[in-house]
């Protein structure tokens, strides 16, 4: 039902200050961002290390859905987002287990479909379950071109193997000549 944790969402009053902290101090790579005029908030994704992601959300004016959450705090963890390959199956699974959910929303062209589980039903945590393609939300320089799943680059001691990461983006593996030989033998055995 759940593929992985996609991101942790942090609500903040000061988007610029948060972006500076995560990018300039912690080294996060800024990704996709947008403003939602209906619920009056701005969101931006940031990738860290192995492409773990944070989403920073902030109100864009009075009447934002974040007003109540930020009323007595400057910032805090707002929700976690879990990725599913099939939102309809996830909904049926939750219903079969008596877990209430709300907020079904399908964005235009099917780029993102979501539901939420209220904190009272999820041990104090707001959970967003969403169906989407991970690479659609990443900065271009942390992912492969469409259709590319791996890349091999020769180094002085062996090679760097870079693979498409199941959560979007790519992950690199340094291998010396001995490890490359073992990999070659394993691949030959798999093809035999």
What do the PLM-derived regions correspond to, one by one?
Residues 5, 22, 51-57, 77-84, ...:
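Short, structured motif recognition centered on aromatic/hydrophobic residues
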Residues 2-4, 71-77, 165-168:
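Short glycine-enriched loop/turn motifs at secondary-structure junctions
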Residues 91-192:
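Vicinal oxygen chelate
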Residues 1-2, 10-53, 89-112, 117, ...:
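Core segments of cupin and vicinal oxygen chelate
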Residues 62-109:
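Charged surface patches that recognize polyanionic ligands
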Residues 49-51, 60-61, 85, 120-121:
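Short loop segments at secondary-structure junctions
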Residues 61-66, 156-160:
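Short amphipathic beta-strand starts and helix->beta connectors
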Residues 11, 83, 173:
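Active-site-adjacent beta-strand anchor residues
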């Amino acid at each position: 039902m759940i593929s992985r944790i996609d991101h942790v969402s942090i609500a903040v009053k000061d988007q610029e200050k948060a972006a500076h902290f995560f990018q300039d101090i912690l080294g996060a790579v800024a990704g996709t961002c947008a403003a939602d005029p209906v619920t009056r908030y701005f969101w931006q994704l940031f990738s860290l290390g192995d492409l773990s992601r944070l989403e920073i959300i902030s109100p864009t004016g009075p009447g934002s859905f974040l007003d109540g959450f930020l009323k007595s705090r400057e910032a805090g963890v707002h929700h976690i987002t879990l990725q599913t390959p099939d939102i309809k199956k996830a909904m049926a699974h939750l219903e079969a287990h008596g877990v209430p959910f709300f907020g079904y929303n399908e964005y235009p062209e099917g780029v993102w479909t979501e539901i939420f589980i209220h904190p009272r039903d999820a041990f104090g945590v707001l959970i967003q379950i969403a169906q989407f393609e991970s690479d659609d939300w990443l900065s271009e320089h942390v992912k492969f071109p469409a259709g590319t799943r791996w890349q091999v680059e020769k180094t002085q001691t062996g090679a760097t193997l870079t693979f498409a990461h199941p959560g979007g983006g790519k992950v690199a593996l340094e291998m010396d000549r001995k490890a490359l030989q073992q990999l070659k033998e394993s691949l030959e055995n798999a093809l035999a």
